[in-house]
Curated annotation (Swiss-Prot):
The gene is nuoB1. NDH-1 shuttles electrons from NADH, via FMN and iron-sulfur (Fe-S) centers, to quinones in the respiratory chain. The immediate electron acceptor for the enzyme in this species is believed to be ubiquinone. Couples the redox reaction to proton translocation (for every two electrons transferred, four hydrogen ions are translocated across the cytoplasmic membrane), and thus conserves the redox energy in a proton gradient. NDH-1 is composed of 14 different subunits. Subunits NuoB, C, D, E, F, and G constitute the peripheral sector of the complex. It holds the Pfam family Oxidored_q6. This is NADH-quinone oxidoreductase subunit B 1. Residues 1-23 are annotated as: Disordered. It comes from Rhizobium etli (strain ATCC 51251 / DSM 11541 / JCM 21823 / NBRC 15573 / CFN 42). Residues 1-12 have a biased composition (Polar residues). Binds 1 [4Fe-4S] cluster. Its EC number is 7.1.1.-.
Length: 194
């Protein structure tokens, strides 16, 4: 077993690069013996060096806590997401009952004028950074009740929306895809300066 060399020369592992300075492209302290020794030690042990913001983004995407704001029939599809068939918790997306413990709010259903202040109050109670998923045609733009006098024509008039999930009602797979898109968006953008 093992790798056989093409020539009679023994196989040698690559030299460890250590911590790379992004401005120069060379290892940090490459001309300093002390830093060269530390870089060799870290590279030899298999350490991963990253920025703090990337570490926070990675941790945040794997531990999103969501709060339900089910207003109509879309809430039934939202509940299916936690059931064993889809089991959204395997993606690190767990439900919470309190807005003070949640990062994500899923607005599912028709938002009326009377309910809009409550939605804003719950949104304001969530800690930063906070994200909102608008689920279904009614939450996205009023849906079937768009021309009613008592319906808000899209919850983006009350709170900022990060992900729109279309459908009437959208399937649990569509909402799961929206959750995965939100995690991708969090990885792509910084959470500290949002």
């Amino acid at each position: 077993m093992g790798v056989t060399p093409v020539s009679n020369q023994p196989l040698v592992a690559q030299q460890p690069k250590g911590i790379i300075d992004p401005s120069t492209g060379k290892p940090i302290g490459s001309n300093d013996a002390f830093f060269g020794e530390i870089n060799n030690e870290l590279a030899d042990k298999g350490f991963l060096v990253t920025s703090t913001d990337e570490l926070i983004n990675w941790a945040r995407t794997g531990s999103l806590m969501w709060m339900t704001f089910g207003l109509a029939c879309c809430a039934v599809e939202m509940m299916q997401l936690s059931m064993p068939r889809y089991d959204v918790e395997r993606f690190g997306f767990a439900p919470r009952a309190s807005p003070r413990q949640s990062d994500v709010m899923i607005v599912a259903g028709t938002l009326t004028n009377k309910m809009a202040p409550a939605l804003r109050k719950v949104y304001d109670q969530m800690p930063e950074p906070r994200y909102v998923i608008s689920m279904g045609s009614c939450a996205n733009g009023g849906g079937y009740y768009h021309y009613s006098y008592s319906v808000v024509r899209g919850c983006d008039r009350v709170v900022p929306i990060d992900i729109y999930v279309p459908g009437c009602p959208p399937t649990a797979e569509a909402l799961l895809y929206g959750v995965l898109l939100l995690q991708k968006k969090i990885r792509r953008t910084g959470t500290i300066e949002r």
